[in-house]
Amino acid sequence: MACGATLKRTLDFDPLLSPASPKRRRCAPLSAPTSAAASPSSAAAATAASFSAAAASPQKYLRMEPSPFGDVSSRLTTEQILYNIKQEYKRMQKRRHLETSFQQTDPCCTSDAQPHAFLLSGPASPGTPSATSSPLKKEQPLFTLRQVGMICERLLKEREEKVREEYEEILNTKLAEQYDAFVKFTHDQIMRRYGEQPASYVS
């Protein structure tokens, strides 16, 4: 006659009152013991696989970094551009004043300096006196100060965009050269180390 006894679990193993999970832990599978030194064929296959993966995905090696010009703002503000234009205009006026005073004090150089004064002031109209007779006359400006500032700002932006494009092109070229050198170096190392060994079924 067979009899069986049932054991009642204590509260520690009750799934409702136990803080731990009621599920049993799975046994971790025993890993097969690996040899201390791998066979040359397997090492060659692993190296060849890594080489093929690197050669097949150049974009992974040449990952596109964010452009260093992305967070760079314009160094010159509109107010600074206008201030520089004003200072340059004052220097030009002072230079013209010095040239006219030099011509008045030294009459022998008047004939030599006449073409230069003609270029600065432009040809005189028939109804007005010549530029040499009235060098300090007020000229009619072609552009306002704000218009000149807008022109200079636009030229600076165009120049900045051109420099940015040249930098990106040079950077991509250098990265491509580095990648080609990396591929060639890896291929030479594989051929030097495993080139003379016979091919196995793994490769």
UniProtKB/Swiss-Prot annotation:
<comment type="subunit">
    <text>Homodimer. Interacts with IPO9; the interaction is direct. Associates with 20S and 26S proteasomes. Interacts with SMARCD1; promoting SWI/SNF complex recruitment. Interacts with NFKBIZ. Interacts with YWHAB.</text>
</comment>
<dbReference type="GO" id="GO:0002821">
    <property type="term" value="P:positive regulation of adaptive immune response"/>
</dbReference>
<feature type="short sequence motif" description="Nuclear localization signal">
    <location>
        <begin position="22"/>
        <end position="27"/>
    </location>
</feature>
<comment type="similarity">
    <text>Belongs to the akirin family.</text>
</comment>
<dbReference type="GO" id="GO:0051147">
    <property type="term" value="P:regulation of muscle cell differentiation"/>
</dbReference>
<keyword id="KW-0653">Protein transport</keyword>
<keyword id="KW-0391">Immunity</keyword>
<keyword id="KW-0217">Developmental protein</keyword>
<keyword id="KW-0963">Cytoplasm</keyword>
<keyword id="KW-0399">Innate immunity</keyword>
<feature type="modified residue" description="Phosphoserine">
    <location>
        <position position="18"/>
    </location>
</feature>
<dbReference type="GO" id="GO:0000785">
    <property type="term" value="C:chromatin"/>
</dbReference>
<keyword id="KW-0832">Ubl conjugation</keyword>
<keyword id="KW-0678">Repressor</keyword>
<dbReference type="GO" id="GO:0031144">
    <property type="term" value="P:proteasome localization"/>
</dbReference>
<dbReference type="GO" id="GO:0016020">
    <property type="term" value="C:membrane"/>
</dbReference>
<keyword id="KW-0813">Transport</keyword>
<dbReference type="GO" id="GO:0045944">
    <property type="term" value="P:positive regulation of transcription by RNA polymerase II"/>
</dbReference>
<feature type="modified residue" description="Phosphoserine">
    <location>
        <position position="21"/>
    </location>
</feature>
<dbReference type="InterPro" id="IPR024132">
    <property type="entry name" value="Akirin"/>
</dbReference>
<dbReference type="GO" id="GO:0003712">
    <property type="term" value="F:transcription coregulator activity"/>
</dbReference>
<keyword id="KW-0805">Transcription regulation</keyword>
<dbReference type="GO" id="GO:0002250">
    <property type="term" value="P:adaptive immune response"/>
</dbReference>
<dbReference type="GO" id="GO:0021987">
    <property type="term" value="P:cerebral cortex development"/>
</dbReference>
<dbReference type="GO" id="GO:0032755">
    <property type="term" value="P:positive regulation of interleukin-6 production"/>
</dbReference>
<dbReference type="GO" id="GO:0005737">
    <property type="term" value="C:cytoplasm"/>
</dbReference>
<feature type="modified residue" description="Phosphoserine">
    <location>
        <position position="57"/>
    </location>
</feature>
<protein>
    <recommendedName>
        <fullName>Akirin-2</fullName>
    </recommendedName>
</protein>
<dbReference type="GO" id="GO:0042742">
    <property type="term" value="P:defense response to bacterium"/>
</dbReference>
<dbReference type="GO" id="GO:0030674">
    <property type="term" value="F:protein-macromolecule adaptor activity"/>
</dbReference>
<dbReference type="GO" id="GO:0006606">
    <property type="term" value="P:protein import into nucleus"/>
</dbReference>
<keyword id="KW-0539">Nucleus</keyword>
<feature type="short sequence motif" description="SYVS motif">
    <location>
        <begin position="200"/>
        <end position="203"/>
    </location>
</feature>
<dbReference type="GO" id="GO:0071630">
    <property type="term" value="P:nuclear protein quality control by the ubiquitin-proteasome system"/>
</dbReference>
<keyword id="KW-1064">Adaptive immunity</keyword>
<dbReference type="GO" id="GO:0045089">
    <property type="term" value="P:positive regulation of innate immune response"/>
</dbReference>
<dbReference type="GO" id="GO:0005634">
    <property type="term" value="C:nucleus"/>
</dbReference>
<dbReference type="GO" id="GO:0045087">
    <property type="term" value="P:innate immune response"/>
</dbReference>
<keyword id="KW-0804">Transcription</keyword>
<keyword id="KW-0597">Phosphoprotein</keyword>
<keyword id="KW-0472">Membrane</keyword>
<comment type="function">
    <text>Molecular adapter that acts as a bridge between a variety of multiprotein complexes, and which is involved in embryonic development, immunity, myogenesis and brain development. Plays a key role in nuclear protein degradation by promoting import of proteasomes into the nucleus: directly binds to fully assembled 20S proteasomes at one end and to nuclear import receptor IPO9 at the other end, bridging them together and mediating the import of pre-assembled proteasome complexes through the nuclear pore.</text>
</comment>
